[in-house]
Amino acid sequence: MARWLTGVACGVFLSAVTAVGQGCGSEGATSLFDGGTPAAEQGESDGRNFGDGANRDGGVGSTDPLSSCATASAETNRTPVYMQLIIDGSGSMDGFDGTNYIAGEREPDPASPGRLTGKKWIAVRDALNAFFADLEAKPDPSMAVGMYLFSSTVQKSASKVDVPIAFVDAAQASALRARLAPPIFPNSGTPLYTAINGQLSTLKSYTPSAPIPAGGKYVLVVMTDGIPTDDTQGCITALDAAKKGNPEVISFAVGVGNEDADPATVYDEAFMAKLAQAGGTAVPGCNPNWGNADKSGTPCHFQITPGTKTAAQIRTDFLAAINAIRDTVTSCELPLVKPAGAGQIDPANVNVVFTSSSGTDTTIPQNAKDGWTYDSPTNPTKVTLHGDACDALKADPQGKVRIVIGCKTVVEVTK
């Protein structure tokens, strides 16, 4: 894969607030955060980092080292993500050029014994199945996923819901897999504008239901191996309007095509770059002209080049792309909202506690490498988890984070 997208931020929202009694909160301040003592002068730690257990077995309670001074605790959760996938089911995904099957573009299909299938289709189908299986295995109440497959041997109207956006439990994962399974195979053209226009409406009209909360981020993922057979500019205009609309929709572009292909009739990297730029997900400093003639820098979109690769190799690339997108929209930013009963808050008396889905509490130290930091040391509005702490939060979707107010901040000195 040519690049790893970074830099798209999304927040989390305050879901529950609980006052926990009196302690060592800051008195007499004139603002939400009164400045206090710089965190570096507070309870410093020279332990390893997140999860080392050194006086960090968190939570507010009788056995908790924070219980004697904590004044309030605010539970936070990630901002939910509503993701709609648009998947290319056109004939070229099956190695068909409109007249003939292209030599070297098809392989024996493990899902359909005795049939040769386009290696791009085998790869994308199997990668998406792995993505769905992972979501099912680690249920994430902050992520809902739906899908629209355009063209194919079982075509559905772009103005209709295909696989509805929903929490990915066993039933949803099964529905997503079934939409890609034999006897469904690639067929026909690439009506990408029609697909984008119709499915933006589907995404924006999504109403979350339990366990998916409201207030989420709208994400469109467009995957194609060709150029539109309907309206190229319309695709770009639609994504740009969605990015500027209400609700805002950010769009990722995943291109599966060779750089030396004819950009007028087969595959155009510049078009894919424009989709990413219009959708608000092009990495800063990317090369919008990245392609066969100019491979300097990185492409603005997710570029997967099949070339002479096998379906298994293309699958690895595509799965990395879809997981990178998931990682990008998954937040490690937590808002610092004043809890009820907290009084004035000193930023040097704030701690972050992570509770795993198994119930283990860990007080995360303030540390820019593997702990957490403020967005502003004097007037913070949020904390951001880094390194090990962020990885732990993302790896345990059902874990919880609490902002504990009133106790001297546990600080870890980076060595």
Predicted regions and their residues:
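MIDAS-like acidic motif and immediate structural context at the N-terminus
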Residues: R78-T117, T224-D225
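Sec-dependent bacterial lipoprotein signal peptides
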Residues: M1-Q22
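An active-site-proximal "capping" alpha-helix that borders the catalytic cofactor pocket
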Residues: G118-K138
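VWA/integrin I-like adhesion module and closely mimicked acidic/polar interface patches used
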Residues: E44, N49, A54-S62, D97, ...
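Structural recognition of the beta-strand scaffold that forms the well-ordered cores
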Residues: Y82-I87, G91-M93, A144-L149, V219-M223, ...
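C-terminal "exit" segments of structured domains
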Residues: G25, C69-N77, N289-K415
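Ser/Thr-rich, Pro/Gly/Ala-heavy low-complexity intrinsically disordered linkers and tails
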Residues: V17-S67, T71-A74
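Short, charged loop segments at secondary-structure junctions
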Residues: M93, R106-L116, E136-S201, I227, ...
